[in-house]
From Swiss-Prot:
This is D-aminoacyl-tRNA deacylase. It comes from the Bacteria. One of its GO terms (molecular function) is Ser(Gly)-tRNA(Ala) hydrolase activity. One of its GO terms (cellular component) is cytoplasm. Homodimer. One of its GO terms (biological process) is D-amino acid catabolic process. It comes from Staphylococcus saprophyticus subsp. saprophyticus (strain ATCC 15305 / DSM 20229 / NCIMB 8711 / NCTC 7292 / S-41). It catalyses: glycyl-tRNA(Ala) + H2O = tRNA(Ala) + glycine + H(+); a D-aminoacyl-tRNA + H2O = a tRNA + a D-alpha-amino acid + H(+). The gene is dtd. A motif (Gly-cisPro motif, important for rejection of L-amino acids) lies at residues 136-137. The keyword RNA-binding applies. The keyword Flavoprotein does not apply.
Amino acid sequence: MRIVVQRVKHASVTNDSVDNKINKGYCLLVGVGKSSTEADIATLAKKIVNARLFEDADGKLNLNLQQVEGEILSISQFTLYADVRKGNRPGFTQSMSPDCANELYEQFNDTLRSYGINVLTGEFGTDMLVDIANDGPVTIIYESQDGKII
């Protein structure tokens, strides 16, 4: 499982059936790979919720999402598993099938919510307009395999 975490001042996602917006928090771009498991969900959710990516009074990255009462906008993004080694068109054979990926994506969001975080989402498997006001910018890529951060 591969997740791009962006600290944001605000972020939104819209399409024909979704219109969600958060203020201060994280915008997550969530990729589910063929080998992603429930262990990866638990590992990454805990790591992201506890990540100290917000500045304290001294300007150090020392505060986590809960300490700043932040929110999460979670966006599914199968293109995070693009293979660009051959040719000019990316391949997506390392992305999990949509049905299975959606199930793990929903479990991931539910796990984040279990920490008391307000989590809004886009619509899985559709084209969406995502507006991100990256704060800093602070952008971190998290990846887990077999329940371990890699």
